[in-house]
Amino acid sequence: MSEFNFISRLHNRGLISHITNEDNLSKLIENKSISLYCGFDPTEESLHIGHLLPLIMLKRFQIAGHRPIILIGGATSLIGDPSFKEKERVFNSNYNVNIWTEKITKQISCFLDFNCGKNSAVLLNNNTWFKQINILSFLRDVGKYFSVNTMINRAAVKQRITRPDQGISFTEFSYNLLQAYDFFILNQQYQADLQIGGADQWGNISSGMHLIHRKTKRVVYGLTVPLLIQSNGIKFGKTESGTIWLDSNKTSPYKFYQFWMNIEDANVYYFLKLFTFIKVSEINKLEKNKNIKNQIINDKSLLAKHITQLVHGKEKLLAAERITKFLFLKNTTHIEESDLQQLKQDGIPFIEVSNVKDLQEALVLTSLAQSRTQAKNMIISNSISINTEKIRKNHIFHEKDKLFGKFTLLSRGKKQHSLLCW
């Protein structure tokens, strides 16, 4: 297989976990434009960074001339995918799913081009066909093609079945058939020959390929991207303070940017290959120089810039960079009121104040100091700053200390900060 074909380039970036009939799929997509799809169940009001790889994969295919189909699981989200889940999901209401569908649709729409000719992206909702099918038709037309023996041995659900304290309901057990039917419908009506997803979706994707082959004798394909696990065993995108969301109202662009700045050094160049469109040859050159002073930090910044702009746009990237310079480089020149609102949202601890008189009191209130005595000693030792300016004696707050009349940044050393909100 040529090292220059599309599938080989995906391998070269470490983007493929599973793939079926690789040679045939590679020939197919080199010879014609295909349609492919990826599904997203609206089980929350926002997608998170665990969804980024499939979204970016769709974008890569579109850039290569193929038509991406995004399937919103308006129906399947009412059931919930049990794959590798330790316990049964809590059912979501129709009301919530409808609201979440609207929000997630807007998020996803920013990633792809919906007006570029034959390979314009398509956005669908599987509620369109599931609301039209009755249970008897589904069991006859779909269920008869699946062996329960095979289904219970799938790794995605086997751990639940073998746990007497949990088990799995018939409702969740049937999810596999619902997703298989999605692939069948998209293949029949939209000529989707490929489904992509996370590695945990391999069982569901395989079921879709099986159903299509049994009903139509057609050969279709599946491809999954890696599931990323951090060194502590936690799924990528989870932090001590919670999930990193794509919605700027749930995770500010600044916090999103900082997440990438704080990834483990060992992952920097791998993530540049996974999440950016920078050429692999250029990334390899950067990696060769990683031991040069500040090179890793610069390359983390490159990663953070690319992904923040992809998800949030240029303006919010610039805001994240301004806030970073404000906190860590003491640069207040271009800081804006909206930047400080981001810090208040989730960037650093904050407290609402009205009548705080002096710095020692404020340090105790913000827990930067445990007592006024400790606060006094920290001030004397030159470790306290107000709005990035060092303070060497106790300070009475004035209007000039309030940025935009609302905010005062207190810092202890380089890494501990708190925001006074007046």
Swiss-Prot record:
Short motif ('HIGH' region): ranges: 42-51
Entry's EC annotation: 6.1.1.1
PANTHER family according to UniProt: TYROSINE--TRNA LIGASE, MITOCHONDRIAL, TYROSYL-TRNA SYNTHETASE
Keyword Calcium: no
Keywords: Aminoacyl-tRNA synthetase, ATP-binding, Cytoplasm, Ligase, Nucleotide-binding, Protein biosynthesis, RNA-binding
GO biological process, one term: tyrosyl-tRNA aminoacylation
Compartment(s) of residence: Cytoplasm
GO MF annotation terms: ATP binding; RNA binding; tyrosine-tRNA ligase activity
Chain sites annotated for binding ATP: K238
Binding site for L-tyrosine: Y37, Y175, Q179
Pfam families linked to this entry: SYY_C-terminal, tRNA-synt_1b
General function of this protein: Catalyzes the attachment of tyrosine to tRNA(Tyr) in a two-step reaction: tyrosine is first activated by ATP to form Tyr-AMP and then transferred to the acceptor end of tRNA(Tyr).
UniProt-recorded name of the protein: Tyrosine--tRNA ligase
